[in-house]
Amino acid sequence: TYCAEIAHNVSTKKRKEIVERAAQLDIVVPTKLARAPSQEDE
């Protein structure tokens, strides 16, 4: 099992692409929701 960390300055759009690709490759991304907009505000 592999683990990846996404830098804090990566845009939300790119972060989403990275997380989707990591899921395909079975890579754990613990910081995947670090910059995701809150769903509670809607």
Curated annotation (Swiss-Prot):
The gene is RPL32. Belongs to the eukaryotic ribosomal protein eL32 family. GO terms for cellular component: ribonucleoprotein complex; ribosome. It comes from the Eukaryota. GO terms for biological process: translation. Keywords: Ribonucleoprotein, Ribosomal protein. This is Large ribosomal subunit protein eL32. One of its GO terms (molecular function) is structural constituent of ribosome. InterPro entries: Ribosomal_eL32, Ribosomal_eL32_sf. The keyword Mitochondrion does not apply.
